[in-house]
Regions:
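N-terminal glycine-rich phosphate/pyrophosphate-binding loop and immediately adjacent elements
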Residues: 2-121
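Short beta-strand to alpha-helix junction loop
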Residues: 62, 66, 143-148, 191-213, ...
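Rossmann-like flavin
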Residues: 97-180
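A glycine-rich dinucleotide-binding beta-alpha-beta segment and adjacent secondary-structure elements
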Residues: 158, 162-175, 323-328, 381-438
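Helical element adjacent to the flavin cofactor pocket in flavoenzyme catalytic cores
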Residues: 188-238
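Mid-domain catalytic core of redox enzymes
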Residues: 229-339
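C-terminal segments that line or cap access tunnels to active or ligand-binding sites in enzymes
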Residues: 292-399
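A conserved FAD-binding loop/helix module that cradles the flavin
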Residues: 434-456
Length: 458
């Protein structure tokens, strides 16, 4: 069978592109190597409990019925409703550095007031930076790369405030160490500080299942356990894909969410040479299940971004895990109408992917246990001690990410160099997802939609 478009990967970007194309009656097939959907944002069941992977919160929160903003645009493009996502807002989050704490909510004025109180000498420059952000066209697909640190330092002179602003933005959306492209900085600043966090009561599985159901209702074909081994081409155009089992599927266009380096490795011999280095920003995450709600222990923040050093370090650590900084997320601390079934504390820290990939199997589990203990030791400097209430634990590493997503190095935010317009050396092979450049859950979905609109609905 020949399709109008074959999509590689059933993550957020691939599913969203599939829905957009199928709505316009394109014949679309989504191919997913793994046994479940979601890619970097997925879910699993372990010891009779449900776990989310990837999702701490959905950024770009907006109240139902809002006409402006990325989330409203996303729902319109997918022909979905606010009820399909069922987002509940965060309560409050914090950025914690030595001797300084900034709170923020989904009301941007709260963050502005916090900056003014903690950094009175910097507030005028901060307001000018906010104006610069408002005027910047971050979604221009032909944009040039500009250092965000260079731009921000033109407005803010205090390095502590600079690092406190960068900390959540980098943790939730930077593929590059130590700095960000200014356009990506603008996207993340707006999505986290201007709009804020939300989460479905049922977690990421709700959104994924709604997308799949919508895609199939429009006539789309979704195949699991259908990994792509090779992209065949002739005269500069992709002609078909070959699956791991040898099946060949023809298509007029191919859209890949597998990553730039991963996709270009699939192109059969004789393809035009192009450089695509995989990223190496990856994480270890500790997930603790509690016998009580975190609020019962005095922890009410939704997310805490912390650094124990006045200078924030965002890069691949030389140690297996960077214990100097991290993210503490409690899925319980959103404004739900009823409590979750159990308490959760998720702690995420930068990790060295090469260490975790190369561990012998007989050392891997012990190493996970060791670093889980050390990660929690670091986290309880910033939240109440909770270990006596832990009833179950799971830990994932860059090795886990590599196994279940196929992303080289277990990288979460893709390659440092993005293919912003989605074009590859083959005229009808396009990229969406992390290596196109829109990151996060809403960003990934908009990436799929944007590339579908630009290249596949002509």
């Amino acid at each position: 069978m020949k399709y109008d478009t074959v999509i590689i990967g059933a993550g957020m970007s691939g599913l969203s592109a599939g829905v957009r194309l199928a709505y316009y009656e394109k014949k679309v097939c989504i191919l997913e190597r793994h046994t479940t959907i979601g890619g970097l944002n997925s879910f699993y069941r372990l010891r009779k409990r449900n776990y989310d992977v990837g999702l701490h919160a959905i950024t770009n929160y907006a109240e139902p019925g809002t006409k402006q903003g990325p989330l409203s645009k996303l729902l319109r493009q997918l022909r979905m409703t606010w009820e399909d996502f069922d987002l509940r807002p965060q309560l409050r989050s914090s950025i914690v550095f030595p001797d300084c704490r900034l709170h923020f909510t989904n009301q941007f004025s709260v963050f502005v007031d916090q900056v003014a109180a903690a950094f009175p000498s910097q507030i005028d420059g901060f307001r000018r930076l906010v104006q610069r952000i408002a005027e910047h066209d971050a979604l221009n697909l032909e944009r040039q790369v500009v250092s965000a640190r260079q731009v921000v330092s033109e407005y803010i002179r205090d390095p502590l405030l600079v690092d406190m602003i960068f900390c959540p933005l980098m943790f939730y959306g930077s593929a590059t160490p130590r700095d960000m492209d200014f356009s990506q900085f603008v996207i993340m600043f707006k999505s986290i500080f201007h709009e804020g966090f939300g989460r479905p009561f049922e977690g990421i599985r709700l959104i994924l299942k709604k997308l799949v159901r919508h895609f199939r209702s429009l006539g789309g074909d979704l195949r699991l356990r259908a990994g792509v081994r090779e992209i065949r081409h002739t005269s500069g155009r992709a002609t078909s894909v070959t699956l791991d089992d040898g099946t060949e599927i023809e298509a007029d266009n191919i859209l890949s969410s597998a990553g730039a380096a991963e996709t270009l490795r699939m192109i059969s011999p004789g393809s035009p040479p192009v450089k695509a280095e995989p990223g190496d920003i990856s994480f270890v995450e500790s997930i603790s299940v509690l016998d009580c709600a975190p609020a019962d222990l005095g922890h009410r923040d939704t997310i805490v971004f912390y650094s124990d050093s006045p200078a924030f370090h965002y890069e691949r650590p030389s140690e297996p895990v960077d214990l100097r900084s991290g993210i503490i997320c409690s899925p319980n601390n959103f404004d739900y109408s009823e409590p979750l079934e159990d308490g959760r504390i998720r702690i995420t820290a930068l990790a060295n992917p090469h260490h975790w990939m190369n561990l012998p199997d007989d050392q891997y589990v012990a190493e996970k246990d060791h670093w889980n203990d050390r990660i929690i030791d670091s986290a309880v400097k910033h939240i109440p001690e909770f270990r006596s209430h832990v009833i179950d634990t799971d830990v994932f590493t860059p090795r886990t990410i590599r196994r279940f997503t196929g992303h080289l190095n277990g990288c979460v935010y893709g390659a440092p160099e993005k293919f912003v317009n989605g074009q590859t050396p083959l005229s009808n092979l396009f990229l969406c997802g992390t290596d196109q450049g829109f990151l996060g859950i809403v960003g990934a979905m908009l990436s799929g939609i944007t590339i579908a609109n630009r290249h596949l609905l002509k």
